[in-house]
Amino acid sequence: MKLTVNRIVKNWDGASKIKYTTTGFVENPMGPGRRFAKQNIDNELWEDAFKQFNLTNIKKDPLYGNILMNHYKDDAFTHIHQDESQEGHVHVRANVMLKKPEEGGDIIIDDNTYQIEVNDLWLVLASMEKHGSTPIKNGERLLFSFGASVPEKEVEKILQ
């Protein structure tokens, strides 16, 4: 899917302001070596993440919320999938790479692989785009995922 905004914000200023907890991890049943933990985040930072992509008419994602995702075993990856959304809305994720393994952990969106570095922020229209990640090696992948439910009309503004 082509966007009118840059999909990736390199070295996002807000990355250093993210406060997260690594307690409460739950194993992800969708694959080995994957886990996640729900997070509470400052509203201003959450809004700023989406403003980077010109998305302002947003509400908190009621399905998944904000989460910390971790791949911690070699060969762990996120399978290619599309998420659900509420009718008339798009499930949107603004993700920040907090820690990256020596190999892998890059994102895949609609069959395109994007190399992401620590502190990069990227946008996924999770209910419209097939997305996942490449398998990791030699280290772990830790990312913070801001979740939003965005009216379809708002998302149309950033589509080509």
Tell where the protein language model's regions lie, with residue ranges.
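A short beta-loop-beta micro-motif enriched in histidine and acidic residues
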Residues: 63-65, 77-94
